[in-house]
């Protein structure tokens, strides 16, 4: 575990030193890289979050916006973390981040609404994200424990327990049918303490997550794969 942490932090340091992934170019008119504009998802939306895996648990993450003239602009870049076991999620608990193009279908957090264009839920002590695979227990959905007092808490996430990670969150609509066992609680969220990986989520620094929350729109697509498979380069 110690060796994995050291390797992960080393990879993150390298990403931070790279010109394309170091300082976020928030608010500046920086053209999006050609490989981003060539992604199939770019033809389906006017806003993208791109997660390009670099190494097993680190990623180059960027946000892009198409203007009224059809020109793509890169509005945010940052290094970040993906699942402890890398990419290619297939089941609950495999510690992998999903591969593909997905929408964000829910915005929430421990902090108050930062002005998100998606409906935002400020969570309290009653809120869990269900990992309960039994019928009727709202697998892979936000639930109020008062309505589901028999929820399997051990396999669900009590949102407020993740004080740093879940200040701001966007749910990645990976398991669209809420199929039990396929995977749950796959979010884009803030960095947590110490660990250079996630359980399958996408993690970025808190200030970058706040930027995403303030700029994301309902039609945004998040594209996740290795940087190589995306045709990208740093």
Tell what function each PLM region has.
Residues 20-26:
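Sec-dependent signal peptide cleavage junction
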Residues 1, 14, 33-36:
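Intrinsically disordered, low-complexity regions
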Residues 201:
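Short cysteine clusters
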Residues 10-18:
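Bacterial N-terminal signal peptides
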Residues 1-11:
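Bacterial N-terminal signal peptides that target proteins for export
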Residues 204:
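A conserved hydrophobic position in a structured secondary element of the catalytic/binding core
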Residues 26-198, 207-234:
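Cell wall/extracellular polymer interaction/catalysis modules
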């Amino acid at each position: 575990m110690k060796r994995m942490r050291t390797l992960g932090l080393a990879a993150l340091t390298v990403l931070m030193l790279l010109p394309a992934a170091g300082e976020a170019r928030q608010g500046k008119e920086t053209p999006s890289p050609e490989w981003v504009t060539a992604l199939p998802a770019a033809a389906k939306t006017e806003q993208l979050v791109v997660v390009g895996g670099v190494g097993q648990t680190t990623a180059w993450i960027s946000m892009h916006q198409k203007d009224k003239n059809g020109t793509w602009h890169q509005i945010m870049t940052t290094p970040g973390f993906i699942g402890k076991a890398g990419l290619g999620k297939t089941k609950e608990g495999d510690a992998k981040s999903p591969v593909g193009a997905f929408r964000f279908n829910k915005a929430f957090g421990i902090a108050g609404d930062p002005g998100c264009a998606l409906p935002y839920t400020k969570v309290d002590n009653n809120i869990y994200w269900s990992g309960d695979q039994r019928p009727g227990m709202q697998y892979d959905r936000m639930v109020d424990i008062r309505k589901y007092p028999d929820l399997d808490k051990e396999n669900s996430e009590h949102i407020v327990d993740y004080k740093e990670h879940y200040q701001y969150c966007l749910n990645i609509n990976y398991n669209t049918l809420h199929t039990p066992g396929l995977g749950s609680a796959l979010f884009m969220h803030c960095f947590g303490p110490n660990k250079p990986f996630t359980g399958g989520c996408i993690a970025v620094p808190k200030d970058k997550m706040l930027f995403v929350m303030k700029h994301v729109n309902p039609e945004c697509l998040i594209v996740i794969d290795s940087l190589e498979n995306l045709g990208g380069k740093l």
